Design a protein with these regions (language model features):
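Charged, often Cys/His-bearing segments associated with DNA-binding zinc-finger transcription factors
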Residues: 1-10, 153, 341-342, 351
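Short alpha-helix plus adjacent loop in nuclease-associated cores
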Residues: 79-127, 168-170, 267-276, 280, ...
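Glycine-rich, often acidic, oxyanion-interacting loops/wings at catalytic, nucleic-acid
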Residues: 130-220
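Extended, structured, electrostatic nucleic-acid-contact surfaces
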Residues: 2-10, 202-227, 235-241
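Low-complexity, acidic/Ser/Thr- and charged residue-rich accessory regions of DNA metabolism proteins
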Residues: 266, 306-351
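Glycine/alanine-rich phosphate-binding loops at beta-alpha junctions
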Residues: 1-79, 86-88
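Phosphate-backbone recognition surface of nucleic-acid-processing proteins
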Residues: 89, 95, 220-223, 229-317
Length: 351
C-alpha cells in the first residue's frame, strides 16, 4: 500500500521517538497495519500535515512535548504514552517499529494514563527547577567534601550547614597545626565553590519566586499550608492545571505518596510508599509537611488540625510526615483544579 493511501485510512498512529528519526506505525479501525515508515524528526510535521485527523500516540520522552504541540496544531488528538505502559503491547523482539506498534495499541486503551503536553512556559519553569536542583546537589557535595577533609585531620564540626559556615573561617585561620598549607588552599578553593553555588541558587530561587507571584495558579497554591513559591511553581510546571487527575488521591498516587499494595484474596497487605512518579515534587511536599510538623502550636489553625493532632498520637514521625504530605498534595490539586484559594474551615470546639 502506498504511503499516500495509507495516510488516508490510518485511524491510529503510533510514533516511536529517536534523536534524529521517528518511526511510525498506522493502524486502521480494524487494527491492521496500513502505515509503516521512518521520518526525520524535522519532517514529521510536514509528513502528517495532510493526514486526516486521527489519534496519535507518541512515546513520552526527550523532546516529545514540542512534537506533540506541533501535531496537535494540525488538529490531531495527540497523547504521550509512557514507555512502561506501551511495553506490554510489544510483540516479539524489541525494535523501533515494534515499539511504535505497541504505542499505537496502548494509546487506544482507556486505562492508559498519558503524560500531559507541557506548554513552553511550563518547560521554562521546569528547566529552572532542574537547574536549581542540580546546583543544590553540587553544593551538598562540596559541603560534604569539606567536612570529610577536615575530619581526616581530626576536625569534626557539628551537623548543620549553619555551623560549618560559621566555624570554617576560624578553622582555616587558626588550625595550621593540623592542616597543611596545601590542604588549607584546597579547602579555601572549595569554600569559593560553595559561595558561587550559593549565589547561583539564590539568583534562580529569586527568579522562581517572581514567576510564582506573577502566576494566579501559583498564588492560589501558596495559600495551602506548607506550600511556598518553590512547591507551587514546581507543581504548575509538572501538571499544569491538574486536569490529568480525576481526583486528588490520583495525584497523591502519581507522586508515590501512597502505600504499595500487595493484596490477594481477602488479605489486604500494605507496604512502604511506592515512590513512583515525580521524585522532585514528592520531596518538596515531604519538606513542606515536615515544616508544618515543627510547629504543633499552629496545627489547629488548619482544617486538618484535629486529624493531625490525633494522628500524631498513633503514628511514627516519618509516617505522620508522609501522611501529611499526601493530604497536602490532595488539597493542592483541588485548589489548582477549582482555581480558588485554600480556605481553612475549622470546626469550633464545643464544651
Amino acid at each position: 500500500m502506498s504511503h499516500k493511501t495509507a495516510a488516508t485510512v490510518a485511524h491510529t498512529i503510533g510514533i516511536d521517538t529517536g534523536k534524529n528519526t521517528l518511526h511510525l506505525i498506522g493502524l486502521d479501525d480494524q487494527g491492521a497495519i496500513v502505515l509503516r515508515e521512518n521520518v526525520a524528526r524535522g519532517r514529521i510535521t510536514a509528513r502528517l500535515a495532510n493526514v486526516p485527523r486521527c489519534l496519535i500516540g507518541i512515546e513520552a520522552g526527550m523532546a516529545t512535548h514540542y512534537v506533540a504541540r506541533e501535531l496537535s496544531a494540525l488538529g490531531h488528538d495527540v497523547k504521550q504514552v509512557p514507555p512502561a505502559y506501551a511495553k506490554p503491547f510489544r510483540q516479539g523482539h524489541k525494535n523501533d517499529f515494534r515499539d511504535a506498534y505497541a504505542i499505537a495499541e496502548a494509546v487506544q486503551r482507556p486505562s492508559t494514563r498519558c503524560v500531559p503536553v507541557k506548554t513552553d512556559d511550563q518547560l521554562d519553569l521546569q528547566a529552572l527547577h532542574r537547574v536549581r536542583s542540580r546546583l543544590v546537589g553540587q553544593r551538598t557535595a562540596v559541603i560534604n567534601q569539606i567536612r570529610s577533609f577536615l575530619l581526616e585531620h581530626g576536625i569534626a564540626i557539628r551537623q548543620g550547614l549553619r555551623f560549618l559556615r560559621q566555624q570554617l573561617p576560624d578553622i582555616l585561620a587558626k588550625r595550621s597545626d593540623v592542616l597543611s598549607p596545601r590542604m588549607i588552599r584546597i579547602i579555601e578553593d572549595l569554600s569559593g565553590d560553595w559561595r558561587r553555588l550559593d549565589e547561583r541558587i539564590e539568583h534562580i530561587t529569586a527568579e522562581i519566586e517572581v514567576l510564582a507571584q506573577g502566576s494566579e495558579s501559583c498564588r492560589q497554591l501558596m495559600t495551602v499550608p506548607g506550600v511556598g513559591p518553590i512547591i507551587a511553581s514546581a507543581m504548575v510546571a509538572a501538571i499544569g492545571n491538574g486536569t490529568a487527575f480525576a481526583k486528588g488521591r490520583d495525584f497523591a498516587a502519581w507522586l508515590g505518596l501512597i502505600p504499595k499494595q500487595m493484596s490477594t484474596g481477602d488479605r489486604t497487605i500494605l507496604g512502604r510508599i511506592t515512590k513512583r512518579g515525580n521524585r522532585y515534587l514528592r520531596t518538596l511536599f515531604m519538606q513542606g509537611a515536615r515544616v508544618i510538623l515543627l510547629r504543633p502550636a499552629n496545627w489547629m489553625k488548619h482544617s486538618f488540625g484535629p486529624w493531625l493532632t490525633a494522628a500524631a498520637n498513633r503514628l511514627h514521625h516519618n509516617v505522620l510526615a508522609t501522611a501529611l504530605a499526601n493530604k497536602l498534595a490532595r488539597i493542592a490539586r483541588t485548589v489548582l483544579m477549582q482555581a480558588r484559594s485554600y480556605e481553612a474551615r475549622v470546626e469550633p470546639r464545643t464544651a
